[in-house]
Regions:
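Polar/charged low-complexity regulatory segments
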Residues: 2-236
């Protein structure tokens, strides 16, 4: 009768702790608990229509990246890819605002979960999936040991860091240069397109600027163990 239609009660509304992806179809949040039994909610940042991330303790230190891809034409469901850069306890909760289905990924305290690359989720495109599911990520991905050094470059051969478009970025006030390359199953290869978020972290995409493939961060832990920590989370 001329009155505007009300927004559905369950429509996703983005805020400081809520990430809305796929044109607000999915409502995403994460809660955490650390080793001192402190708890909180992740702080959300939207990166694109299908990608976003969360930080827990410091805005310069991102802890989790998530993306949701419409895979209806391939597997008949929406795909959920996420990775974490923390070993605190966390629950990543994803809710489909259209079907009201809820998918929860649980990471126990002390497990450095690398997350999940899930192409067969409960979010079936025809709405036929179960109402809820909880996945314990520690079952498939126990805490790893010391990271393996892949390659080391003589510091004498490295000059001052200078950004080069999106092929090379500088972090920690120019101390570190970040570059990336990729190769696929068909023999294709190329440079990663890098995006600097802040002095401690950034992202990379390979094929599509809306499809983030990697989160990386550097943490100054010199006062703890004399090192700068390097963490990388891939979504591919």
């Amino acid at each position: 009768s001329g009155l505007p239609e009300e927004e559905p009660a369950d429509a996703c509304t983005p805020d400081a702790t809520t990430l809305c992806l796929q044109s607000d179809k999915f409502n995403i949040g994460v809660t955490w608990r650390d080793f001192q039994n402190r708890t909180g909610q992740g702080r959300a940042t939207v990166l694109s229509n299908q990608s976003g991330d969360f930080w827990f303790f410091n805005a310069q230190s991102n802890e989790l990246i998530v993306k949701i891809i419409n895979g209806c034409g391939s597997t008949g469901s929406y795909w959920v890819f996420w990775r974490a850069l923390s070993n605190v306890e966390m629950d990543l909760v994803i809710r489909d605002t259209a079907t009201l289905q809820t998918l929860t990924y649980h990471n126990p305290l002390g497990y450095n979960s690398n997350g999940h690359l899930d192409i067969d989720t409960i979010f079936r495109c025809d709405g036929s999936g179960p109402a809820a599911e909880t996945i314990d990520t520690s079952v498939d991905l126990p805490a790893p040991g010391a990271p393996q050094r892949i390659e080391r470059t003589d510091p004498a051969l490295i000059g001052p860091c200078a950004p080069d478009g999106d092929r090379s970025i500088c972090l920690q006030n120019g101390r570190f240069r970040v570059q990336g390359t990729w190769s696929d199953f068909n023999g294709g290869s190329g440079y990663a397109h890098l995006i600097k978020k802040n002095e401690g972290s950034g992202y990379a995409w390979f094929f599509n600027g809306n499809n983030y493939e990697m989160l990386f961060k550097l943490v100054d832990a010199c006062s703890y163990n004399g090192n700068t920590w390097v963490s990388i989370a891939g979504l591919t």
